[in-house]
Amino acid sequence: MFAGYRKLDNLVVIVDLNGLQIDGAISEICDPEPLDKKFEAFRFHTITIDGNDFEQIAKAFEEARATKGMPTAIIAKTVKGKGVSFMENAVNWHGVAPNDEQFEIAMQELEKAGEALCQK
């Protein structure tokens, strides 16, 4: 409330909205939606993006920098564990470290995903 009231246009809040928390889907436990409307009620400019898309992230920060007279909330809709087949959207990976074998597999999958991004 303070940030919006004071028009803190140099403040950017980023919310990682992956739809999961430690014990399940947030929609079944404590659904925060509509999150954008809640921030707007506190005088925030809101931007909702695909948080797994680097171009959208960069554009959101450009828009936030250009926004005057109010703070910005970037709501980044993401996929938990994106790019690692056995971790994607898996609640059981919250706060758990992979073993050595899982780590190697994850790194290989992420390297392939990174190479694909560089080809764009």
Region spans (language model):
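Glycine-rich ThDP/TPP pyrophosphate-binding loop and its adjacent helix/strand module
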Residues: M1-K120
